[in-house]
Amino acid sequence: MDDKLFVYNALDGACTFEIRDAIWNDIKADGYGWTYGATIRLFEPLIFMMTRGIKINHEALAETKQDIQAASAAAQAELNKLAGRELNAQSPKQVQTYFYVEKGIDPYRGKEGQITADDKALARIARGTARRPGMREARLIQDIRGYEKLLGSYMEIAFDPDDRLRAAINPRGTKFGRFSTGKTVFGTGCNLQAMPQEFKKFLVPDDGYFFMEKDKRQAEWVVVAYISGDARMLHVIENGLDPHVYTGAMMLREQLPPDLQRQVTDKDLEDIVRLDSKVIGMLTDADEILQRRMADKTLRNVYQFLPRTMSIRQCGKKANHGLNYDEQYRMFALMNEIQESEAMKIIKLYHRIYSGIQHNFHAWVKQQLSKSGRTLTNCFGRRIRFLDEWGPDLYKSAYSALPQSTVVDGLNIGFCDIYEDDYITRTMNLDILAQTHDSLLFQVPITVLTSGKLYDVSRSIDKYLSPTMEYGGRKFTIATDTKVGWNWSGMHKDRNPLGLQELPECRSKLEFNQLVHHTLGIRQGSGVAAARNMASGSTRSTPAGAR
């Protein structure tokens, strides 16, 4: 290699330090010293992750590529049958002609007024309106495009010569502290942060290891609760309730006649939400949902107060995930494929239940922006300045800033603490392989489990990942869920039986060890040899869809 490149690289590094020294006083004076220090601390563990990479199961990758191609072909065949001819889902012209000319639908337009049949337009066409039923063809086109994107973006990724997936990680890739990831300098790898579940199934632990994922539970929702001080949100967290069930139950309560509201308890309503979730599951067809509810002697009495196209628990989940940052009804309807009138109703109910979000949290953020020169500072010391034009878009960005940055900063502090703990990463030989905003992926030697040491290691990791935070005089931590499995995707009994499975709360070391052995399919006392073949078991499945 040319010596000029080495000299250039050395000068580049030296100049960076000279620049740092020149502006260091300004960095500290402006309050960005914490952010600088936290970023520098991340470099060594990030370099480890980028160097280590994750093993690929190529056989399973090839099998699922075939399955996705078959699913795409089946969707195309159904689309052609409905259209009465071959319809190219990838052709904007053909798709626009089909819906806007042949079917007579009023054209949807993009931001600059141009006619479009992009994903948002297709979602609206598939959803339908009060005057027009939804169209199956639009959903099929979305699915076909999704399958093709999955094939092109993830099934054709260039891997490194050692059959591992690596990514370049930028610790300052986003405004609020989240990492951004992409291809390496060698042109291999991909964006790990946006990786679909279908692909994660082919990322597997090295021989003699299993995967353990630590995931912060309802993390941003918890932060919003403590910033806002909303009594109902705090009640959910501090009593260990299911927030999606509770939100659904309170939405149901708000719609009941006053005399009936006085007769039922919160537990009664939560039981109805759980029953509805069991009966409806993930169905979205309004007619089938109504039929199932009318067949149940309990649900038929309250069906008129339940959402038409999903279970009430699913409604609570979508509201919890989407409405803390002032999402408006049109976007909520589009993202969740429901009618705008339903979206308006859900949003009104949500903010009636959790009034502290708008009255306390949003009002406080606006006040802080005005008082502190458009700047917010999270509980760890990260300062975020907003330079956009005053208005709804700036406020929405600011509402999300503190919860997002608080979660990722708390996680990254724990990430560094774990990496620097010699017992965990060197004596026990755990590898940290990935960070995805609110979770960490580890590969753990099977010997750590079979020797009975996993419980203590897991608890140490949980402690590192649970720093005490404070907003408005309210101190709190965010609970951590533990998942174990033989690949990085979520467990499904049919589609991915070897995937990550969440462990319930355990009362003792013995119970924890028994549960992990059972979840991984390792017979206690069988040793490492009996477990080594688990990760290479069949992962063949029919994909649920690219969307």
Where are these predicted regions, by residue range?
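Metal-dependent catalytic core segments for phosphate chemistry
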Residues: 213, 220-266, 381-389
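A common structural junction motif
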Residues: 460-472
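Conserved catalytic core of nucleic-acid polymerases
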Residues: 44-51, 162-167, 171-174, 255-257, ...
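Short, conserved charged micro-motifs
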Residues: 447-459
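Short secondary-structure boundary/capping segments
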Residues: 102-104, 185-189, 227-231, 450, ...
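Conserved "right-hand" nucleotidyltransferase catalytic core of DNA-directed polymerases
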Residues: 1-198, 204, 208-210, 217-220, ...
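Short hydrophobic/aromatic beta-strand micro-patches
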Residues: 441-445
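Hydrophobic (often cysteine-bearing) scaffold residues that line and stabilize catalytic clefts
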Residues: 12, 220, 240, 244, ...
